[in-house]
Amino acid sequence: MSIKYIASSKLPTPWGVFEMHGFEDSETGKEHVALTLGVFDAESPILGRIHSECLTGDALFSLRCDCGFQLQTAMQNIAEAGQGFILYLRQEGRGIGLLNKIRAYELQDGGANTVEANERLGFAADMRKYDMIIPMMEQIGISKVRLMTNNPRKVKAMQSFGLEVVERVPLQVGKNRYNEGYLKTKSTELGHMMSEHHFTEEGKD
């Protein structure tokens, strides 16, 4: 495995002081981060999330997606539980990178949905991989998870690596008039498990 643990430090946030653990992929050069809060019992399921980098949503407060809302809600949920983790993976734009994501947004501005835009650029709908989570989870000492996600691929990925997903915790947050179509596409074409209320006009916040 090409993932190497580098260092850890404290990370004060609005939701508490997390521990930040840095990892480097020697093959790709990408740097991944695990955030942890609290003390873990190896036999108890720990609340957590696998979160793929989204500069536009996480840092620039974009309303085109639900990523930033999911990250903040996950951190808040972990703080309320008193323990938990987030694996922050550098897989911008479902794995196509930031500039290609902007190209995809340009196509979406012209009427394509998020899947069609990726495919027109020559990419699969979702290019992400999750094998890097194995050494990350080993380093932070977690094998049983209550996973905050709407994406069944993340559940299957964890299970395929021998991690026990005791519960899937839905994260249906961040719906607004700019991302209703995006959320619907994630549900109908990417298989994300969301209630229809979360992406329909009738369920508008």
From Swiss-Prot:
Coiled-coil stretches: none
Catalytic residues as annotated in Swiss-Prot or TrEMBL: D126, R128
Catalytic reactions on record: GTP + 4 H2O = 2,5-diamino-6-hydroxy-4-(5-phosphoribosylamino)-pyrimidine + formate + 2 phosphate + 3 H(+)
GO molecular function terms listed in the Swiss-Prot or TrEMBL record: GTP binding; GTP cyclohydrolase II activity; zinc ion binding
Database matches in InterPro entries: GTP_cyclohydro_II, RibA, RibA-like_sf
EC number: 3.5.4.25
BP GO annotations: riboflavin biosynthetic process
Transmembrane segments: none
Pathway, per record: Cofactor biosynthesis; riboflavin biosynthesis; 5-amino-6-(D-ribitylamino)uracil from GTP: step 1/4
Pfam families cross-referenced by the UniProt entry: GTP_cyclohydro2
Protein name (database record): GTP cyclohydrolase-2
Source species of the chain: Shewanella piezotolerans (strain WP3 / JCM 13877)
Gene name of this polypeptide: ribA
